[in-house]
């Protein structure tokens, strides 16, 4: 079981991810609606894993990943994004993301990616 921070500006997407994660035995310790809040909650809760949208207000997901990765390079971050452009995904991975999931997704994709990240840790 992982302690997970879910970050997405869509309340619906946060709810969907939270449901999938809890149904599969993980603990969602906090939810963020923007990158700035994601960084604050990361510092407060010290999650094992973070799901992070790219396009968010106040601070985008890539900038948040850079800050989080600089503070703790061991935390695993999975980008969950509707942006399927390879250049954007490559930028997120260079910033410190561990993997990515392109929206729309299904529960099995989410869990396969999380299980892969957790088991490689």
Language model regions located:
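Short, conserved "switch-loop" micro-motifs in signal-transduction and mechanochemical regulators
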Residues: 83-84
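Active-site beta3 strand of CheY-like receiver
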Residues: 45-51
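Receiver (REC) domain active-site loop signature in two-component systems and cognate sites
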Residues: 56
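C-terminal output helix
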Residues: 105-114
């Amino acid at each position: 079981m992982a302690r997970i921070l879910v970050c997405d500006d869509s309340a619906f997407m946060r709810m969907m991810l939270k449901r999938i994660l809890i149904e599969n035995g993980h603990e969602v310790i906090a939810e963020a609606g923007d990158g700035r809040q994601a960084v604050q909650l990361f510092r407060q809760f010290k999650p094992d894993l973070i799901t992070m949208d790219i396009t968010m207000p106040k601070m985008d997901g890539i900038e948040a990943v850079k800050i989080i990765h600089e503070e703790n390079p061991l935390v695993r971050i999975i980008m969950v994004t509707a942006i399927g452009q390879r250049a954007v995904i490559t930028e997120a991975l260079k910033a410190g993301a561990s993997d990515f999931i392109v929206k729309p997704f299904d529960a099995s994709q989410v869990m396969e990616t999380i299980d892969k990240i957790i088991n490689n840790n």
